[in-house]
């Protein structure tokens, strides 16, 4: 069964100032699931309490790649376990050179194994650039698919913006997709999304 939630980045203008109040607002709107885009220094126990008092479940987090480096991953795991979150999504990385690509893929592979051992799935959220061929000849999304076990969080608008059909993309990658971001954009992108339910 499909579960729908809200990416808290959508409320980025207010979450940093009042994360607790933002969660109440989201719950009052009728959402049951939230994907965090930062905790702004709040303790895990506080976030857990705010989720509980609003009847919300953390479906995932957008977490910077520094948090999955060997020196930081234990604390990251502890925080996610404390708030009951089983999905950690990397929202982007620096893919500007072939060397950085190799470093990133190695980091994703190492972190994915460690997180999986702790009951947490690692995913990667695309923007348009991951679907475009780099100057060094690689298409990042295809490298992630072929060379890691990381799951995918497909952002339908950014995929469309890169010239792909989001519906066809989601169908092709359905066995690797953990989460889908349904996002509006220019009108032609919105019309394209009406063709199917990714």
Which positions does each model-derived feature cover?
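N-terminal pre-domain/capping segments
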Residues: 1-86, 151
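Acidic/histidine-rich catalytic cores of soluble enzymes
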Residues: 117-198
